[in-house]
Amino acid sequence: MPDDLTGKQRRHLRALGHHLDALVQIGHEGITDALAAHASEQLRRHELIKVRVLESAPLDRREAAEELSARTGAALAQVLGRTFLLYLRDTEKPRIELP
């Protein structure tokens, strides 16, 4: 799933994610199993989440985005500054309708 979003779908997700607050923060410990589990839970609840990479994080923002995307099975919709958006469609009850 991580790379099957079209440009139009990414644009739609970026618009929806603009007003979101970061639900997950990556700090000095980097991406731990607990953080990945928390991100997965938030994706199940919301489908689209914003993640912030703190300055103390040992990973580059792009590396962090790609690693968390791979560990959660989510699509990377956007990387902007120290934040990025992850999207994982709920197969049972989708809340976000993609174009």
Outline where the language-model segments fall:
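Positively charged, polar, low-complexity stretches
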Residues: 1-99
